Design a protein with these regions (language model features):
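Short, well-structured beta-strand
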Residues: 77-172
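Secretory pathway targeting signatures of secreted, lumenal, and periplasmic proteins
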Residues: 1-102
Length: 172
């Protein structure tokens, strides 16, 4: 797999942190050294949805270059939680990444799980939004979902979106 890296950003391969059975693992860092996204392959996933939360889909884009068995994954930036809180306890309230799962519908959604089908099982490329890590303009005391919406309009987010949506197989 290959992707387009924003100027002045770097990729770090944290040696020794691969999934059992191999795979790739890379951290993408901005010029200040902050981790903006991670790419991992050969991920074994499983989840259950025992509780749902209010959500908002802030941005999506289809990624046909990553289609597997007729399923076209999507880039998504989405939130979970209530307007006045940073999200459910122990669950990140906003994240951006690639997903093969269906986008939420109805008034509530399961916690964010950004994984996509990739041989031999699945992969991930994305991160959770953190206003302490992601350069977000405006009043830092705004409710968390509002900060995520403001972040969506930044140049940093545009770079992240362009980088993640550029992911493609090397052989194609």
């Amino acid at each position: 797999m290959v992707f387009d890296l924003p100027a002045a950003w770097s990729v770090k391969d944290p040696a020794g942190e691969l999934a059992e059975g191999g795979g790739a693992y890379a951290e993408v860092r901005n010029k200040g050294g902050r981790v903006m996204a991670t790419l991992r392959t050969n991920m074994a996933i499983g989840s259950s949805c025992t509780q749902k939360y209010p959500y908002e889909v802030l941005d999506t884009a289809d990624l046909p270059a990553l289609a597997q068995d007729g399923v076209v994954p999507q880039f998504a930036f989405e939130t979970r939680g209530y307007a006045g809180t940073p999200g459910p306890p122990g669950v990140q309230a906003a994240g951006y990444g690639i997903t093969s799962g269906p986008m939420p519908s109805g008034p509530e959604a399961c916690p964010i799980l950004h994984f996509f089908r990739w041989p031999p099982n699945s992969a991930m490329f994305g991160a959770f939004y953190d206003p302490a890590n992601n350069a977000t303009p405006g009043d830092p005391s705004l409710p968390y979902p509002e900060l995520a919406k403001k972040y969506r309009e930044t140049a940093e987010y545009a770079d992240i979106r362009e980088m993640i949506t550029s992911l493609r197989p090397v052989a194609r």
